[in-house]
Amino acid sequence: METFKRLKMYYWPYRKVFMWSLLAMLLMTAITVVYPIILQITIDEIVLGRQYQLAAWVSLGFIAVMVLKGMATFFHQYLGDMFGIKSVYRLRNGLYEKLQRLSFSYYDNAKTGDLMSRLTADVEGLRFFLSYGLAELIRFGLLVAISLSVMFYYSVPLTLVTIAVLPFLAVAVYRFDKRVHPAFRGIRKSFAKLNTKVQENISGINTVKSLSREDFQISTFNKANAEYRAQYLQTSSIWSAYFPLMEFIGNTCIVALLSYGGYLVMQNQLNPGELVAFFSLVNYMMWPIMNLGFVINMFSQAKASGERLLDILEKEEDITDHPHALHKQKLTGDVHFKNVSLAYGKEQTNALCNVSFEANSGKVIGLLGPTGSGKSSVTQLLTRFYSPVGGMITIDHKPITDYSLKTLRSNIGVVLQESFLFSSTIRSNISYGRPDASMEDVIEAAKRAQAHNFIMELPDGYDTMLGERGMGLSGGQKQRIAIARAICLNPSILILDDATSAVDMQTEHSIQLALKEVMKNRTTFIVAHRISSLKHADEILVFNKGRIRERGTHHELLEKGGYYKKIYDLQYRDVKMINEPHEVG
């Protein structure tokens, strides 16, 4: 029950709804026990006692009881569903809010399919238990307690025979729960893996088809599907062994009751109607006991689901605002790195080692280096996507941890290497970071990003709906919309992380001309592999293996003849070869 205690904040606010549902269930359960009593009166008083004048009244009473039970059942079912639905609505919102707050380090290891499984299948499993299973557990206790009370009234010896069987049923139920809970946890994990395989395949379908790896993907999916099947078959074997055992114990009890009860009737120690009523009560009690396995099944599934949901809900948030964080509308944009080091994992080598530089407001800083050299790590630290393991980063002479995350990130416009567009209108995508932006602001941002012309050529212009991840646009078009989104934010600091890598040389040149105007009075970091993208920067930092190897302007670095010069020669060698005349012999 510890799992449900830790989830209490999500369902406890709706306890009044649940209590009303329980009240209706109490009435429904009490009426259920009235049926055998009416049956006993009919046999002993009307049939054997020949009081036929009571038949009409008993029939009317029986109809009234059935109507009352129907109404109680309706309210119990409706209010129970309302309790479950409202609880998981709150829970699902809490999960989604938590996912928004978790840092990049969590998503480095998380799998999309697994997260989707938790937010759908696991939440739904918990809802089903809250709506139905929890009330059934309570109903089971009530029905057994009320039935035993009436049974003791009819015959103490017969009731003791019934109670003698209960320990065997309790042991069977306990052992079933111990075996079925791990099995259902395995099912949840297998389903999450299956989800991940499907999600990865759909997301990477272009790669799969271009490399003709359909058969390989089918085989990996079949393997995951086979594991899921094996987990379900294991659970099925547990169920298959449990139900015959429960039925055998129940039937043994019934045979004992009929034998001993028949003897008591023959000895005139029990009326025939009382034996029939007693037998009906045993049936009413035995069915919930046998059905307890199904309820425990729901409980085990809900518990396994709850544990997986708590893995997210109780995950520590690495990057948060401190209690007295500064909230500012606009920052100046003076950036200072002081001996900053970064490691993405505890056992990994540092991605950055003792990096120091200054970027005053309005300056353009170029970050150049091979893949994995630490260029993008600088920008990820600046936006507090990750926290450094050493050193200090300041903006406007204050540590970035002094600012609220909202203040910091609303003043930093970022265009990542892989631009992500949402499945909404182009206008919504451009104004995503600034929802209150006017249409004029959106158009101005698009013009500066060289996106306005192709947007106007689309059938619905800025109201054109994009497909998932911007499907329907070329890579260059998506990148330009992403740049427009960053410009629309009107940030104090602009980060272009290989932002022009997906556009052709002519478009790159046009964007750079437009960005020169945008970069005025705005600190800009340009992360690039191509020297052409950042040679106009006020200072270029050349990274290699997490350290700054060289720094200076484009011309200063060329004159040094160092690492930067080697990169320059490699990138422009092909251009020189094309421009030189070749003899054709």
UniProtKB/Swiss-Prot annotation:
It is found in: Cell membrane. GO terms for molecular function: ABC-type transporter activity; ATP binding; ATP hydrolysis activity; ATPase-coupled lipid transmembrane transporter activity. Pfam families: ABC_membrane, ABC_tran. It comes from the Bacteria. InterPro entries: AAA+_ATPase, ABC1_TM_dom, ABC1_TM_sf, ABC_transporter-like_ATP-bd, ABC_transporter-like_CS, P-loop_NTPase, Type_1_exporter. Residues 335-570 form the ABC transporter domain. Coiled coil: none annotated. ATP binds at G369, P370, T371, G372, S373, G374, K375, S376. This is Uncharacterized ABC transporter ATP-binding protein YknU. The keyword Transmembrane applies. GO terms for cellular component: plasma membrane. Disulfide bonds: none annotated. GO terms for biological process: transmembrane transport. It is a multi-pass membrane protein. Belongs to the ABC transporter superfamily. The chain crosses the membrane at residues 18-38, 55-75, 128-148, 150-170, 238-258, 276-296. Keywords: ATP-binding, Cell membrane, Membrane, Nucleotide-binding, Transmembrane, Transmembrane helix, Transport. Residues 18-301 form the ABC transmembrane type-1 domain. It comes from Bacillus subtilis (strain 168). The gene is yknU.
